[in-house]
Amino acid sequence: MLARPDVFPGARAAACLTQFKRQSPLIHCLTNEVVQELTANVLLALGASPAMVVEPTEAAQFSRLADALLINIGTLNASRAESMLAAIEAANAAGTPWTLDPVAVGGLAYRTAFAQSLLGEKPAAIRGNASEIMALSGLQASGRGVDSADDSLAALPAARELARNSGAVVAVTGVVDYITDGQRDWAVAGGDVLMTRVVGTGCALSAVVAAFCSLPGDRLDNVATACRVMSHCGEMATRRAAGPGSFTPAFLDALYQLRPEDLQ
C-alpha cells in the first residue's frame, strides 16, 4: 500500500504567503480562453499582477519582464503553441520560472505530444489532475477531457517519476493534493467539491502555483503553499456560498482577505 505523505505544515505556508505579499509578483499567463477572467481575478485578489500577452513576438518580450510564466494548454492551437514556445524560450533565457498545466493531456493526441515536448524545456512546476499527470509521465490514465477518473494518491508514483525526469516540482491535485520534487512529498487537504462545479478553479490554481514559483527558497514548499492557499479559500467560500453562482465572488473575497496566520 502506498504510504500517504506528511501534511504540509501551516507554519511553512504562512511564511511563504508573507513573502508572497511582500513581493507582489508579475505573472505572464498564457492560459486558455475559457478561464482568463477568473485567473486574472484570482491573482489580483492575492496581490499579484496578471498579464495575458499572446502575440508571439510580444509574448517573448513580456516573459523576460515577468516574474513567472504560466503555460496552460486548455485551448491549444498552432498560433497559441507558437506563442508558448517563444515565451518559454525567452523565460528560460531570462531565468524566469515557468509552470505547465497539461490540460486534458492523454485524451487528445496533439496536446499530449506538445505537452510532452515541453518537458525538456525545464519547467519549474507542473500542476495537473491525476489522469493528466499519469498520462504526461507515460502511464495509462482514465481521464475524460479536463476531468479525472484517477485518484491523486494513486498518481503520486507517476508524479514523482515526472518530477525526477523533468526537474519540476509536480502537484497532482484532487480531493487531497500531493506535491513532490521526486524525493520529498507533501500532502495538502481541504477545498470542497463545489470548486469542481465552477469552471477554471484548477486553471487558476496553476496560475497561483506559477506565482509562488517566483519566490526564492524551497520550491517544494512554495508550490505546496499555493495549493494550501487555494484549498483554504475554497473552504471559506463554500461556507458563505449557496451554490456555484455565489461561490466565485465568495472565493475571490476569501483570497483577498487571506492572512498568513489563517494558514497556521
Swiss-Prot record:
| Gene responsible for this protein | thiM
> Membrane-crossing residues?
none
* Residues involved in substrate binding: 52, 200
Pathway info? Cofactor biosynthesis; thiamine diphosphate biosynthesis; 4-methyl-5-(2-phosphoethyl)-thiazole from 5-(2-hydroxyethyl)-4-methylthiazole: step 1/1
The record's similarity note reads: Belongs to the Thz kinase family.
Q: What is its EC number?
A: 2.7.1.50
Q: What is this protein called?
A: Hydroxyethylthiazole kinase
Chain residues that bind ATP: 127, 173
Enumerate the NCBIfam families for this protein. Answer: PRK09355.1, thiM
What are the required cofactors? Mg(2+)
Q: Does the keyword Magnesium apply?
A: yes
